[in-house]
Amino acid sequence: MTDFFAGIPQIRYEGEGSSNEFAYRHYNPDEMILGKRMEDHLRFAVAWWHSFAWPGGDPFGAQTLERPWFGDTLDLARMKADVAFEMFEILGAPFFCFHDADIRPEGATFAESKRNLEAIVDHIGARMERSKTRLLWGTANLFSHRRFMSGAATNPDPDVFAWSAATVKACMDATKKLGGANYVLWGGREGYETLLNTDLKREAEQAGRFLQMVVDYKYKIGFEGTILIEPKPQEPSKHQYDYDVATVYGFLKRFGLENEVKLNVEQGHAILAGHSFEHELALAASLGILGSIDMNRNDYQSGWDTDQFPNNHPEMALAYYEVLRAGGFTTGGTNFDAKIRRQSLDPEDLILAHVGGMDTCARALKAAARLYEDGSLERARADRYAGWETPEAKAMLSSSLEEIEARVLAEDINPQPRSGRQERLENLWNRFV
């Protein structure tokens, strides 16, 4: 035990009438929603990097957070893990996520870093044996160290490609050993700063082959989880190759991986790409590649990824409605890829940020479920496309332009516009949220 969270009680559900800030007002893990426990719908995860590894810096200022586990030794990494599991217990968090660099100290060589990773994975595994918290996903940090400044899989130096491949192998082994439900790849440096020194075709082919090797290794080791890619348009790279859902799907199709890899969709990244969160979720679901979500928000006045905790339940309800329409999560879940503000120094701030985020998502899920169960929106959607259910319309899709023209002339087809009823549906939505 550590004393970092001393005096903070375990967070329990007390209902909407509670004024206790250390209580859930909406998140009731055992509440049944559409035939499934709320906890099993949401599958909340705590992000190791933002909660325990982030020092509070920004582009204009250095570290503001002082944590007793900050440092590059295995003993401090073990302390960090102990604090993490104490927080999981306080929150009742069912899952966590990590990068290798979040949990182990950096070694002087790849071999030393791997030994450090294996040692801390053993420690985390021992903590998991005494905990109900499980691993939602693991991943490799292939963007922070200077060796990755020109990319990992897409790097012009084949030695960096080799280092990156070996690192991913080690992280996949760690994820499997800890019983992870997914493995994530995010290409923060897989992109370019200028086209003047970039070979787009070569870099795409390197990235495609890298991912094929990841999928091959999944089967070699018997990893039963899902491989996920997380799209983001830019930051830190000027232009990233995993720009958005549509771009990643095209990449997967190009390399024959559309049935092997799904997506981890983040709200903040969707906003950076000029989309809404629900757009990216709906598109991923329609393409059969929705796997998991990273839950956060951006400051709409800023032009960068601020990774704040969600606090707008009507906005989140739109997202969870799309998750429900897609059938809900299987191996995926809701990872809080969010960090407290750099002025939020106290341990209580870290706990309350997660309490607020979990309550916001729970409230959003309940609103989305009410509308989904009511069926009014889906009936309106079906009615809008009802014409396509007729035999003539279905047959048209397998005919030719000449045949369609002949039918238009013969039947004197002269279609008239129909209202999309947007305002009516927006009013309907507002009644439920």
Curated annotation (Swiss-Prot):
Alphabetical GO biological process terms: D-xylose metabolic process
Gene Ontology MF annotations: magnesium ion binding; xylose isomerase activity
Protein name as it appears in the record: Xylose isomerase
UniProt keyword Cytoplasm present: yes
Cofactor remark from the record: Binds 2 magnesium ions per subunit.
Binding, Mg(2+) 1: E230, E266, D294, D337
Annotated catalysed reactions: alpha-D-xylose = alpha-D-xylulofuranose
Domain of life: Bacteria
Cofactor: Mg(2+)
EC number: 5.3.1.5
UniProt subcellular location: Cytoplasm
UniProt lineage: Bacteria, Pseudomonadati, Pseudomonadota, Alphaproteobacteria, Rhodobacterales
